[in-house]
């Protein structure tokens, strides 16, 4: 039985942004500094997109959404629909309108997939929303555990994160491809989340091997950045010279 979310889809006239835009809440550097409590109500999502990824306050789960349905992926391996009252310190949304579709019908590693997609794109200086549906030979994910105050920096929080391995699984990977110049505001390169076909489990994607998948890409020309109106954000250190290394530590594959 399908579990119901309290998030409601809005009509086109009620939406607050154009389809060529990414609406992002806060910055990756603030998350690195331990700003885990945001003021963005996830009930607002339908104004800004039907597709996206992010996290929840206290880092209590990974956020994934597509086709107007959004889920919380917790560190215990469960997936539940987003509810009214849920908040996020960092998330990105867009209205997904396909510009390119590509079929993968043979085994392909993450590295080979990224090379192939990169060669198809009109420019690496634009933003793209990426969706992959189908059968995956494997998907490796993580979900950071819920944090309690006083918060530690994210490089410390990820040290105890559980790792999940899915084999021969059907599901959907969604996320964004961000140009290098925007690293720190967002996560440069491919930043992806996964949920299985049954909407039971998933997480932040570390690695994957495609088996029989359809890739859909939506090109984005604009970013609307909303900054948190909170004391934690006002007082955060966003001038960390090691932020690029810290992003690789927190978002990249485990060693």
UniProtKB/Swiss-Prot annotation:
The keyword Lyase applies. SUPFAM superfamilies: AF0104/ALDC/Ptd012-like. Its EC number is 4.1.1.5. The keyword Lyase applies. Transmembrane segments: none annotated. InterPro entries: Acetolactate_a_deCO2ase. Belongs to the alpha-acetolactate decarboxylase family. NCBIfam families: acetolac_decarb. PANTHER family: ALPHA-ACETOLACTATE DECARBOXYLASE (PTHR35524:SF1). Converts acetolactate into acetoin, which can be excreted by the cells. This may be a mechanism for controlling the internal pH of cells in the stationary stage. This is Alpha-acetolactate decarboxylase. It comes from Bacillus subtilis (strain 168).
């Amino acid at each position: 039985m399908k579990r119901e979310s309290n998030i409601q889809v809005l009509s086109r006239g009620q939406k607050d942004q154009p389809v060529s835009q990414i609406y992002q809440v806060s910055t990756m550097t603030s998350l690195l500094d331990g700003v885990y409590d945001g003021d963005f109500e996830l009930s607002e999502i339908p104004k800004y997109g039907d597709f996206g990824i992010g996290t929840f306050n206290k880092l209590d789960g990974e956020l994934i959404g597509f086709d107007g349905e959004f889920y919380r992926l917790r560190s215990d391996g469960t997936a539940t629909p987003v509810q009214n009252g849920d908040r996020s310190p960092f998330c990105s949304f867009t209205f997904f309108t396909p510009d390119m579709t590509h079929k993968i019908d043979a085994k392909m590693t993450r590295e080979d997939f990224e090379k192939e997609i990169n060669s198809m794109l009109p420019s690496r200086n634009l933003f793209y929303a990426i969706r992959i549906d189908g059968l995956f030979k494997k998907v490796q994910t993580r979900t950071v555990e819920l944090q309690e105050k006083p918060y530690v920096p994210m490089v410390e929080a990820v040290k105890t994160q559980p790792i999940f391995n899915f084999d021969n699984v059907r599901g959907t990977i969604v996320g964004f491809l961000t140009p290098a110049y925007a690293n720190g505001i967002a996560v440069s390169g491919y930043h992806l989340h996964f949920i299985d076909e049954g909407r039971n489990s998933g997480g932040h994607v570390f690695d994957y091997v495609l088996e029989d998948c359809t890739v859909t890409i939506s090109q984005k020309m604009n970013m609307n950045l909303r900054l948190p109106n909170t004391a934690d954000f006002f007082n955060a250190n966003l001038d960390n010279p090691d932020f690029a290394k810290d992003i690789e530590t927190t978002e990249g594959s485990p060693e």
